[in-house]
Amino acid sequence: MDVEWNGLDTLVVAAGVSALQPLLAIAGVEVENKTELEMTTQEGIQNTVDVAAAATRGNYVGPLVAAVTFVPLLSNTSKSPSILLVNSLASVIPAPTRTLYASTKAASLVLYQALSIEHPNIAFTFFMPATVEGDFRASAVDSGPVRELDPNAHGLKREDVAKRCIDATDNGEKAVFMPVHMRFGHLLYWVWPAFVERAARRKYNFGV
């Protein structure tokens, strides 16, 4: 690749898969507005394991393979190497119905954060947008329904997200939230978690 591409300056890691159901719903147990839960079955547990494996492959193993493949090339061929990880706000602010999605995206975020310490010669940017317009949810590994407001009507515009990604990478920004005020939402979770959890339930129309 270093011969064919003449090296690499910037790596963008943006691939991923969605998951849209509460964790126990994947196992076949309805949890919303229930005071007593059914017991999970062997089939339901196995389905959860299979769905979790698919989410992990897309959201964690994929970025891991990208890092192992391209970090040496970046380090050896670029005078100013950089990596942009397009992650999700759900990786730092927990969301109902996004249990598997959020946890696997959080895993890849911490992976790259640790990697940035191991490779200080590479400029890392961790991009965490809120809901973005488009059909990304069609990739859901659990075939769950979209509960929040129509992403194409209320989500961030793809062109705006792409421009912000480019600017953040060019400027060497580390942790980038979009919209920017969501940075305070992340901090607020540690100060007033009940408020953030109520807002998350409203956004995802869960138990409200």
Task: Give the role of each language-model region.
Residues 94-102, 114:
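Active-site loop-to-helix junction immediately N-terminal to the catalytic Tyr of the SDR YXXXK motif
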Residues 67, 104:
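Active-site helix of classical SDR
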Residues 88:
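Residue(s) in the substrate-gating loop at a strand-loop-helix junction
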Residues 110, 116-180:
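SDR active-site lid
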Residues 17-53, 97:
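Conserved mid-core segment of classical short-chain dehydrogenase/reductases
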Residues 4-5, 21-22, 69-79:
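A short helix-coil junction within the Rossmann-fold of NAD(P)-dependent oxidoreductases
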Residues 72-76, 113, 117-118:
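Alpha-helical segment proximal to the catalytic Tyr-Lys
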